[in-house]
Amino acid sequence: MKEKENSLFNSKMIKRAMKDSFIKLNPKIQLQNPVMFIVYIASILTTVLYVFSLFGIKDNSPSFILFISILLWFTVLFANFAEAIAEGRGKAQADALRSAKKDILANRIESIETKEKVSKVNSTELRKGDLIIVKAGEQIPADGDVVYGAASVDESAITGESAPVIRESGGDRSAVTGGTQVISDYIVVKVSNNPGESFMDKMIAMVEGASRKKTPNEIALQILLVSLTIIFLVVTASLYAYSEFASNQNGVINSTSVTSLLALLVCLAPTTIGALLSAIGIAGMSRLNQANVLAMSGRAIEAAGDVDILMLDKTGTITLGNRQASEFLPVDGANIEELADAAQLSSLADETPEGRSIVILAKEQFGIRGRDLSSSNAKFIEFTAKTRMSGVDFNGDEIRKGSAESIKKYITEHGGDFSDECEKKVEEIARKGGTPLVVAKNYKVLGIIYLKDIVKRGVKEKFSDLRKMGIKTIMITGDNPLTAAAIAAEAGVDDFLAEATPEGKLNMIKDFQKKGHLVAMTGDGTNDAPALAQADVAVAMNTGTQAAKEAGNMVDLDSSPTKLIEIVKIGKQLLMTRGALTTFSIANDIAKYFAIIPPLFIGLFPELSRLNIMNLQSPESAILSAVIYNAFIIIFLIPLALKGVKYREVSANKLLSRNLFVYGLGGIIAPFIAIKGIDILITMLGIV
């Protein structure tokens, strides 16, 4: 079963991360993070300088060099630990998935007609296009599409949800996933991929990070960080030569050591964000996995953070999706109780949510209870797509209910009359966003049942929050424009696309993209595939077809259309976290500059004492304090990098102002306080 991590850490994860921290000291791995590679080289150099100092070749006091060397190694290890702990969360999820994936015997058949002739083969021998039969109690050995039959399937190994789902041939519920189990009946499945290419294989690879590539934003930020590091490297290297020149000019001894300058370089380089950058990206992917969403790339998550157009399906996302009877509206002087009675009689054999709600409404409003008509020679008329109505013939009466067009046709063909009053009420209900069902008895209209598609509680507030963030919401529906406009107004969406077709959705996405917008949408059917392939963030439902899943760049394992809003929030949280910690890291440099530069060169330039605003005890204590802070701030920020900066539904300008205040100003003030405190402590302990 897919596990969800509720806590950031556990003992097993920490032990594995600590072990991996040392494994990551491999130079090839360190080279992947250029900023931390500089710290890695500085750690090696200070270690060599310490060994030299033991043989009398002194750059500084051996104890000072040893302290600096240990702290620099800790800085590298802490960075490795941050990345390893983020990867560990993914590995834990991958282990749970791998336990559900095992080689099993499959029942391969030649064709549906000869399904009784079964050959047993290992699941690893199955190839794309093979037909397999899976019976109750058996595990589905490979991904595919149901081409015959229907069955109840337990997908808890993938989704974590214990409730079984129906998978059947045809339509948008035909896709099945290897590793899931058939609970009842049997199905014939056409295998959709070769070994190693299954949905489960992709999930394991993604959550382990095996196929994770740096996103364009990550690469751009890393280029900035490397550029800053190179600048500081050049500056630090030139400082040694300049200090030698200045000491000769002033006739004083040059107290600036290579160890001190290496410590200065590490403190001034953006090591905090350099250490946490990879962990932030991995953690963003992990948070998405915990939300039961599989992203095909980190780029998709970042795009979710930049999205400014959300295309949302009405049914299931904005409305509850099951229309409920809310009112009986008599016409042409008909009695409302007679209308309710006729409506209930015509719905007694109707097992749809709408039919059951009509029976309940008649009982609640008029005390009319359901009756057993099986012994009364009642003849129930089932709803069909052709007639678009249902009903009952009972005690010589013909009762029908259905769409206005179908009932109008039915009664006019039998010499009845469809009044203007009825036409007006039908139009009025449609304008309000409801669905009118007309009820007729013996070719005479009694009235209308007002079916209301209930807008989900709280969606209007959600859309208002999204609007504040600069995100435009568009409702996609197959309803007529009048109904769509009414529901759109009630839900508070910015726009809508009524009577939506696959071509209409695709063209709308293209139009928005031409104007520079980033578009997100959800889909589950083969007809959604073109639009999903075009969208910047395309979330396919796990219950959807193989074509939809292949077209999307994310798959929602819970198949919940509302998940798109959560995905956008996770994407924005990822970008906010990266920006906040970058701001904090660069702001830190200001305090570290004032901590190290004045004490380091005060012997050459006494005037620099004015810049020693922290009044640190000595050059050695100042450098040690700054390096200690530089190392341990990484550990303190790991929980924030993994959990993410708290997300708020406010405008981009307000978010920017808040983050500049908290992480910019905070990034300047925090090191001043911490470095001064560390300086006092190490002086009291007599370390320097």
Swiss-Prot record:
Recorded superkingdom: Bacteria
Residues annotated as the enzyme's active site: D313
Residues that bind ATP: D350, E354, F383, T384, A385, K386, T387, R388, M389, S390, K401
Catalysed conversion reaction: K(+)(out) + ATP + H2O = K(+)(in) + ADP + phosphate + H(+)
Annotated EC: 7.2.2.6
A matching Pfam family: E1-E2_ATPase
PROSITE patterns xrefs: ATPASE_E1_E2
GO CC annotations on file: plasma membrane
Topology with respect to the bilayer: Multi-pass membrane protein
Molecular function GO labels: ATP binding; ATP hydrolysis activity; magnesium ion binding; P-type potassium transmembrane transporter activity
TM helices/strands, residue ranges: 37-57, 65-85, 219-239, 262-282, 586-606, 622-642, 668-688
Subunit note: The system is composed of three essential subunits: KdpA, KdpB and KdpC.
Family per similarity comment: Belongs to the cation transport ATPase (P-type) (TC 3.A.3) family. Type IA subfamily.
PANTHER family attached to this UniProt entry: POTASSIUM-TRANSPORTING ATPASE ATP-BINDING SUBUNIT
Function description: Part of the high-affinity ATP-driven potassium transport (or Kdp) system, which catalyzes the hydrolysis of ATP coupled with the electrogenic transport of potassium into the cytoplasm. This subunit is responsible for energy coupling to the transport system and for the release of the potassium ions to the cytoplasm.
Protein name in UniProt: Potassium-transporting ATPase ATP-binding subunit
Source lineage: Bacteria, Bacillati, Bacillota, Clostridia, Eubacteriales
Gene field: kdpB
